[in-house]
Amino acid sequence: MEIAEPVTVRCSTLVVRGDCILLCRRPTTDIWVLPGGSPRRSEGAWECARREVSQETGLAVTPDRVAFVLDATSPKGEQHLFEIIFSATEADPSATPCGTEDGLAPSFVQLDALRDLMLLPPIGERLRAFIERSPDRVAETASYLGNVWGTIPEPASS
């Protein structure tokens, strides 16, 4: 029996302000990522995305819809990531992101600058195209169904 390799589940959020996108920079490596992280036990993807944005940037958001779902395997195969990226609405569009988590520096970055950044996973052009094609970030997205696992019904008695 083959043992499955671990897959990291990540819930991220796409927050757009004008022609800028919210990203978090890891200063030690100069890698940029969307704000996000892995869900806690019993935490839905939507809740995880909202919590991670708050923890990493200090901003309050409400995820709207699924913008992307992706698989990413690192070039050497040492990491496999499954990521759900939600579009989101800010509670206060004038709030300034602040680094609340060690090792991350959040900021709004111009869409035109995405091509010059080390964004991981490397989806900068897809993000840019999505935002330009869908300014309201609702068109061409999928619905998030949440936790659909219900209780198993008892068998009918004969």
Task: Go through each PLM region and give its residues.
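Nudix hydrolase/Nudix homology domain
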Residues: 30-32, 101-158
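Unchanged
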Residues: 39-62, 72-123
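Short charge-dense sequence patches
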Residues: 1-6, 35-39, 74-82, 153
